[in-house]
Amino acid sequence: MTLHVRPTDTKKLISGATGDWEVVIGLEVHAQVASNAKLFSGASTAFGGPPNDHVSLVDAAMPGMLPVINQECVAQAVRTGLGLKAQIHLTSVFDRKNYFYPDLPQGYQISQYKQPVVGEGEVIVDLPDGESIPVGIERLHLEQDAGKSIHDLSPTQSFVDLNRSGVALMEIVSRPDLRSAEEAKAYVTKLRTILRYLGTCDGDMEKGNLRADVNVSVRRPGEPFGTRCEIKNVNSIRFIGQAIETEARRQIEILEDGGSISQETRLFDPTRGETRSMRSKEEAHDYRYFPDPDLLPLVLKPEWVEELKSGLPELPDEKKARFIADYGLSPYDAGVLVAERETAAYFEQVADGGGVKRDGKAAANFVINELFGRLNKEGKDVTSSPVTPHQIGAILDLIAEGTISSKIAKDLFEIIFTEGGDPRVVVEARGLKQVTDLGAIEKVVDEIIAKNPDKVAQVLAKPTMLGWFVGQAMKASGGKANPQALNDILKAKLGI
């Protein structure tokens, strides 16, 4: 494997008491495969059922029950690998990972160790400051999820729910290419976006569909990697950032005090803002991996992989590039719009819907600033928007025609958002049309000039005062005066 060697970024260094430190981060993201049935049984993967309601004899590890691979889960893993620009291994092997845990009924987990279904790939991560960084994908393998232990139903007993047991997971392992909490959060956000575009994982972290094991180490700039600690099962992007910052500080304090870091598995406690030791970090030999004798090697036909590849949707990076090229959007605006598949589709229906080709920049500005801003206030997303793309398109058409001004458009949008209706009908019914009658605008301007001779003297000495006259005229016209006509008349009347 060729390692991506990333130069030290001084902006990402952490200041310690004895100098600067660089944090090195790698992530193992566990993504639940979007499928109706589990990896090796026909039991349902539906979330939220009564305990032990979706459990087959295979999931419960009853004697004599043999696993049978779910082809759709394999297809979803291959689609994900293709979406990550990764190598697809036509032959892969399922292994038994041996360890004991109460919610693991087999006494081992079926996973993939030496021969995963997907090899090396890459994710391009866009950071808030406009920088883009490549993050290497080391591998993607399929494995079973475990069940769930429940400890809060009784003070003296623990219970096991096997509904989740046997559900297919994709473990997506990144290289240690990340250098800050912000980069790690951006990486998981981008990875989740790709999975959602592909339809291979819902990415709902609240339901446990996506969770991460976070590997953190620190070193002096330019030195070899330090000893890493793994923070298990972090279940939100915000907590991933907090866990990294907390663990990096803990390690720096130990090293600056002359201590050493023990390689171990830790848990993040968001309430206390600390990581706690869980157990010493296992090595691969501790799990006694060996090929599962109940499962033949998984052999994929090249033409089947090509068929899956031909059916892939347009992914975020390609869509972003197209939005920039076709609609003239800035990289930032295009990035905001493609962050979710639904928002990208909504924008395209506004900019290019109903057979009308609209100004892309104007459409993006209105969708991002007006629609998204209003939805955020209501705690909604675009899928539950009360305003349709057709309605926003109609508002933009009214602006382009000169029927309404940009200011009136905001008022009109608020009416449509709260009350609904056809924008054109609302404009007519409420008298919101822009005043384009030059005579009417001139009359308003004459009245303001006549009433404010002192301001006239000031604007002749200080032309920037023109804005005051514009404001007064707009107020007098109820915000309906055509802004360009108003400016032209004012300048002519005032002689500036």
UniProtKB/Swiss-Prot annotation:
Single biological process term from Gene Ontology: translation
Pfam family name, one: GatB_Yqey
Reactions it catalyzes: L-glutamyl-tRNA(Gln) + L-glutamine + ATP + H2O = L-glutaminyl-tRNA(Gln) + L-glutamate + ADP + phosphate + H(+); L-aspartyl-tRNA(Asn) + L-glutamine + ATP + H2O = L-asparaginyl-tRNA(Asn) + L-glutamate + ADP + phosphate + 2 H(+)
Enzyme class, broadest EC rank: ligase
SUPFAM superfamilies according to UniProt: GatB/YqeY motif, Glutamine synthetase/guanido kinase
Signal peptide: none
Record EC number: 6.3.5.-
UniProt keyword list: ATP-binding, Ligase, Nucleotide-binding, Protein biosynthesis
Domain of life: Bacteria
Disulfide bonds: none
InterPro entries listed in its UniProt record: Asn/Gln-tRNA_amidoTrfase_suB/E, Asn/Gln-tRNA_Trfase_suB/E_cat, Asn/Gln_amidotransferase, Asn/Gln_tRNA_amidoTrase-B-like, GatB, GatB_C_1, GatB_Yqey_C_2, Gln-tRNA_amidoTrfase_suB_CS
GO molecular function, one term: glutaminyl-tRNA synthase (glutamine-hydrolyzing) activity
Biological role stated in the UniProt entry: Allows the formation of correctly charged Asn-tRNA(Asn) or Gln-tRNA(Gln) through the transamidation of misacylated Asp-tRNA(Asn) or Glu-tRNA(Gln) in organisms which lack either or both of asparaginyl-tRNA or glutaminyl-tRNA synthetases. The reaction takes place in the presence of glutamine and ATP through an activated phospho-Asp-tRNA(Asn) or phospho-Glu-tRNA(Gln).
Family per record: Belongs to the GatB/GatE family. GatB subfamily.
HAMAP family in alphabetical order: GatB (MF_00121)
Subunit structure: Heterotrimer of A, B and C subunits.
Protein name as annotated: Aspartyl/glutamyl-tRNA(Asn/Gln) amidotransferase subunit B
